[in-house]
A protein has these predicted regions:
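Short, flexible, glycine/charge-rich loop motifs used to bind or transfer phosphoryl groups or to couple energy/partner
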Residues: 29-30, 155
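Acidic, Ser/Thr/Pro-rich intrinsically disordered transcriptional activation regions
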Residues: 17-18, 23-25
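N-terminal intrinsically disordered, cationic/polar leader segments
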Residues: 15, 30-31, 36
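Alpha/beta enzyme core
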Residues: 2-10, 22, 35-40, 46-163
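N-terminal start-of-chain detector that recognizes signal peptides
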Residues: 11-17
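Short clusters of hydrophobic/aromatic residues that line enzyme substrate/ligand-binding pockets
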Residues: 28-29, 58
Length: 163
């Protein structure tokens, strides 16, 4: 027989809250603190000037032209968000079977990165090394006549894009 007498039911019916009693102890044992400095803001960029286009499947999110991208980036920097992830909307006429637009130095993604780094050198700019935005077929690789990804050719294309 135990020398202790419980006035409450044992665990799990009663769970003590002692670690949550004081604000300082709640901070010490909390799992996660999320601040703007922990965020990466996704941005969808399209060709043109002074353009904003709603993305129907993503309420409140827009595709923006580079000039509008810079306006939004200024606000993000002010808010303390340290990085953006860019997703280009490649015009259909720039897409090809071999995804050459992926490494075009004057391509939309490349111009957007340069503009952001010129105006906001402290802002982290993340891009996706992927070919699907640049291929006419939408595959994330260079395909053969049967629709299979040709790995060696795709790898070389991804290397060109990354550099």
């Amino acid at each position: 027989m135990s020398q202790f007498t419980f006035t409450r039911a044992p665990f799990p019916q009663t769970r003590m809250r002692r670690l949550r009693a004081q604000e300082f102890s709640r901070r010490l044992v909390q799992e996660t603190v999320l601040t703007p400095a922990d965020l990466i803001y996704p941005m969808f960029v399209l060709e043109g000037e002074n353009r904003r286009e709603a993305i129907p499947s993503m309420l409140g999110i827009e595709r923006v032209s580079i000039d509008q991208l810079l306006l939004e980036a200024a606000e993000l920097v002010t808010l303390g968000i340290p990085a953006v992830a860019l997703f280009p909307v490649t015009p259909p006429e720039a897409k090809s079977l071999l995804a050459e637009e992926a490494w075009n130095t004057n391509g939309l993604a490349q111009r957007a990165v340069r503009a952001l780094k010129q105006h906001f050198p402290q802002l982290g700019v993340i891009t996706d090394v992927a070919l699907d935005p640049f291929t006419t077929h939408g595959q994330d690789g260079i395909i053969d006549d049967n629709g299979y990804v040709i790995n060696d050719v795709t790898t070389q294309a991804l290397i060109k894009q990354a550099l």
